[in-house]
């Protein structure tokens, strides 16, 4: 008897791809065969094959906000993508299809529904993306990373790496800390220019005796400029292009300043760290603000829109923080963690396949 097969559809950004890979790893451990539907020219084209997962190529991308000419091309591009998806689906014969978001998931999800192959959809953000809003109407199971995102959906959380869930509690980590606060600044793998600009200025406005110790992930293309900005502000800082061991960096931090992508918010909760979220202002549907509010509304994080994030405001905010408060916020964040999210999604996929057989 051949192993059951799942086709995972996700692409475009790490926020869609990494949760899919987490589910893939669990199902492979259970003896499942995993295939992936994605665009080989995008991020998944590197990340997925590197995990030993065979990818079925499908080139389809979002046209939202690209003007009238792009919309006129949509019928042709969508038809081509549907035909590609049908070909791959006929060859793979999956027992269940899992859509994790990104435009590449839409044609595959439509074909799965037409073939009556069980379709499971997971939406990571607090505001559903275009593809998942449509696919949710066709899916057997709809799962979300945040509450009240799609009608009738089951909120299971967002999959995160096990090393984050395995960190000791905030109370244990903060117990013996003394001296200046430890500040971690993360703008994503590419950095966040607004944070790179404001944070050095803010720390320069804080007297040296009160100034936090800072580690700042800049993004490779901004590293030299960031180092120069800290030097200009008279601030010693550990500036890095990319943090390989994020679990250790979060564990060592008293306070984090970061964007509010769905996976970032999930990782903040899983690690149990006090965070100031500065949402990406131009994200589609302002979904990062909605993501951040999941924790900030519960007093489990802070939220500051980028347009009012000034160096003086941030300097004042940092000097008002102390470890007692930060530990309490970190503990509330961890209370919102969903460490079983990947396993829960895998369980739903297995059950959907069994119901069909």
Curated annotation (Swiss-Prot):
Its main location: membrane. One of its GO terms (cellular component) is plasma membrane. Pathway: Cell wall biogenesis; peptidoglycan biosynthesis. The keyword Transferase applies. CDD domains: GT28_MurG (cd03785). GO terms for biological process: carbohydrate metabolic process; cell division; cell wall organization; lipid glycosylation; peptidoglycan biosynthetic process; regulation of cell shape. Belongs to the glycosyltransferase 28 family. MurG subfamily. This is UDP-N-acetylglucosamine--N-acetylmuramyl-(pentapeptide) pyrophosphoryl-undecaprenol N-acetylglucosamine transferase. Keywords: Cell cycle, Cell division, Cell inner membrane, Cell membrane, Cell shape, Cell wall biogenesis/degradation, Glycosyltransferase, Membrane, Peptidoglycan synthesis, Transferase. It is found in: Cell inner membrane. It catalyses: di-trans,octa-cis-undecaprenyl diphospho-N-acetyl-alpha-D-muramoyl-L-alanyl-D-glutamyl-meso-2,6-diaminopimeloyl-D-alanyl-D-alanine + UDP-N-acetyl-alpha-D-glucosamine = di-trans,octa-cis-undecaprenyl diphospho-[N-acetyl-alpha-D-glucosaminyl-(1->4)]-N-acetyl-alpha-D-muramoyl-L-alanyl-D-glutamyl-meso-2,6-diaminopimeloyl-D-alanyl-D-alanine + UDP + H(+). GO terms for molecular function: UDP-N-acetyl-D-glucosamine:N-acetylmuramoyl-L-alanyl-D-glutamyl-meso-2,6-diaminopimelyl-D-alanyl-D-alanine-diphosphoundecaprenol 4-beta-N-acetylglucosaminlytransferase activity; undecaprenyldiphospho-muramoylpentapeptide beta-N-acetylglucosaminyltransferase activity. Transmembrane segments: none annotated. The gene is murG. Cell wall formation. Catalyzes the transfer of a GlcNAc subunit on undecaprenyl-pyrophosphoryl-MurNAc-pentapeptide (lipid intermediate I) to form undecaprenyl-pyrophosphoryl-MurNAc-(pentapeptide)GlcNAc (lipid intermediate II). Its EC number is 2.4.1.227. It is a peripheral membrane protein. UDP-N-acetyl-alpha-D-glucosamine binds at residues 13-15, 125, 161, 189, 243, 288. Gene3D superfamilies: Glycogen Phosphorylase B.
